[in-house]
């Protein structure tokens, strides 16, 4: 007995056996440089001035994205958030997207002419589609000085950050509920001034247009440029001949140290270093950050002479 079987196989349904896959999302170009200059402008037997300057800058550009990606959202993008971090061809890492005021061809804000929001600015970018800034600075600089006179030493450190934008959702939330200083002043005046235009509907402006985490991102973007006195320390080292007379002490140094003393210049009404986190998806975002700590400290550094072996045994 012979059994004969014949089968035909048509096209197989091309369903991929996975929900997600990893791809090389794009091509990002980074270009940067760093310069450090050390100098001793003054050097005498009693007085010395040493200084060091560090200057750095970095630029990045998204050259290409994966063929299936028009943009890559790597931060919050829901309706309840007024910003999104996106990668777009031609853009940069750190670009912040959100909502902005509608503007005419000359760059002037367009105002609504009818409805409940008549007289209030028009807004575009629902879904966070308008680029409103980039969190990265154009450059950063640190400059320190050390002045020494006999046993005294004074150290100063200046930090300068130039450029970059930061979004304050703290200010947006406070404005929404009318508990910020700017809303109090606006209520007292009876109007808000927006780029030279007077708006009489103060409550409507803050509550219905710009305020809150779903408000106008552009309105709460601040320049992160700042110059601060980062650290100051004053040291005094006692003369060696004084220490020798004690027969116990080898060195004795007293020091006063202060950090985050003050800003010499800043545009934002808060510390631009107070970002939500250092992760890529939260660069340049400030949300109810704790105030910067200013620390003051005093230290005493003591070193002792080594006791002789027979003296050590005698005291044991």
Regions found by a protein language model. Name each.
Residues 1, 33-41, 49-57, 141-147, ...:
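Membrane-embedded beta-strands that build the outer-membrane beta-barrel scaffold
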Residues 2-13, 306, 313-316:
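Single conserved hydrophobic/aromatic residue that forms the stacking wall/gate
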Residues 11-20, 118-126, 205-218, 276-281:
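Flexible, solvent-exposed coil segments and beta strand-coil junctions
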Residues 161-253, 257-259:
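Extracytoplasmic gating/loop element in the C-terminal half of outer-membrane beta-barrel translocons
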